[in-house]
Structure formats: C-alpha cells, structure tokens
Amino acid sequence: MAEKMALAKAINESLRRALDADPKVLVMGEDVGKLGGVFRVTDGLQKDFGESRVIDTPLAESGIVGTAIGLALRGYRPVVEIQFDGFVFPAYDQIVTQLAKMHARALGKVKMPVVVRIPYGGGIGAVEHHSESPEALFAHVAGLKIVSPSNASDAYWMMQQAIQSDDPVIFFEPKRRYWDKGEVDTEAIPGPLHKARVVREGTDLTLAAYGPMVKLCQEVADAAAEEGRTLEVLDLRSVSPIDFDAIQASVEKTRRLVVVHEAPVFFGSGAEIAARITERSFYHLEAPVLRVGGYHAPYPPARLEESYLPDLDRVLDAVDRSLAY
C-alpha cells in the first residue's frame, strides 16, 4: 500500500520493519534511542523495541563502528548512525582497515552485515563537520557498498536492502531532503540496490546525480524545457558500485553528460564517471564530460553556503557550455 511520507519518516519506517522482522537487527548510535536522533529519524524505535535493540552509545564513533563489527561477527545485523557527516572520521580507521576488509581477510568465511548511516551534505545552514560530503573518500575503498537515496521511496527500500546485505553498506542520507515527501509503496518489489534509474527522459543531454542533487537536476531540466531543450536526468543511487552501463546507455542517446554532486569536484566521484564514460563512449560524445560540484575548499560558514553549493545557475551554465560544442 502506498503512503506519502517524508524521507526521514521513510527511513524510520524501514528500520522499524527490519527490527520487527529480525531480532538480530540492532540500531546503535549517539542519541538514537531516547532522543530519536538529532533529525528524529529513529524516533520511537527504542520505546517500541527496547534499550537492548536500539542502543544509545557514548560519543565515540570509532567505538560505535568497532562494536558493530564485533556484533556482526557474532551474527547480528547492526545499523549504526554517525550523527553528522564530519563526525565519521574518528571511525574511518575501523571502516577502512576492518569493516571493508574483514570478508576478504577471512577468505570469505565471515560476513559483515553492517550498515553505517551518515546524514550528509549542506543546505541546512550548518557549519563544517555538519555539512560535508565525504562519499568519495569511501568510494576509493574496496569492500564497501556506498549508496545515497534521493527520495522517500528509495530511502525506504534501499535501507531494507542495505540491512539484508551481507556486505557493509555506507548509507549516505541527504539531510536537506529529510523533509521532502513522496509516495512509498511498502509492498513494492525493489530493483537491485546498485542500479541507476532514469527519472526524466530526454534527448539533448544527460544529467547524472545522486542524493540531494537529483532534485536540483530535475529543476534544471524544467528550466531547460522552457527553452525547448530536453534533458535526461539519471539518478545514480549508488556511488560504489556505479552503474556505468546505465550512464553509457543514456550518454550514447544524448551524446552529452554533466555530472552533479555536492562533494568537491576535485577527485570527486564525477571524475571517475567522466574518465570511464570517456573511455567507453568517446566516439559517441559531442562534448567533454563536465562536472558541477563543491569547490576545493573547506566548507564555509553558513552565510556563504549558497555560494559554495551547486545551484540552478551553475548547472545550467554547464549545460549551456556542453550544448555549445
């Protein structure tokens, strides 16, 4: 049955469903229990499932992830919350040297069904450590799945799939979209976790994005349509692995590609996409692959945030430059 709900509520309902279905599923993190999380994504879960299933932890991200690894080795499926994107770095060692490598290190004999939830990105007027987009730092690490939903339906179903995965999943939640509402069919049959989806058909140029930038790309496509240009919008959904086949298929139709993400353009995921698509589809391209993202600079104070983040004008400028070739 379909129900309209906010993206944050969709994650809450997905966690609730997983906790109810499997006693081995646990939710852990700073203030996830009594408070229900800073963004109230876990609101009510501790009340309904108890303190042994929804666990308030100390302020120690390394310890949170390390504990989750140990629980996974004992057959549990922990879902841990990192309160803000910039707080994940104390746990980076545990994620990179242990969580990502445990399965290969044990020659496939152990599973690592751990989900690391990270609210990420800007757009809420916060400061550094609260508004960053570090997904590329994790995409470089083999052994991790990295996903970011753009809408409530994907948030619900991608969380279900992440919890059911026997491999670790870094689940980046676009906090500026937490309150965006959409239809969620809790009885649907979802597609593969890593598959991209065309959310708008077009023939003149492909816009590829994930997480918070998908909505922006749809707004860009609306603006371009007023000038008679039809842009295809591709929601990548997964940063690692990336559905290069879907990008290639779209580009070989439109012959132009602009990749949009909040993370800095320098060494961002868009660089890998640009390189791969240039290798795969060079003779189909009528313009260089362009990228729009954050600047290679520390995240600015809130009053400068709008100047730092990709916006309608910056993406439209990239579209114009691509179509001018």
List the predicted regions and their residue ranges.
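Thiamine diphosphate
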Residues: 1-168, 172, 307, ...
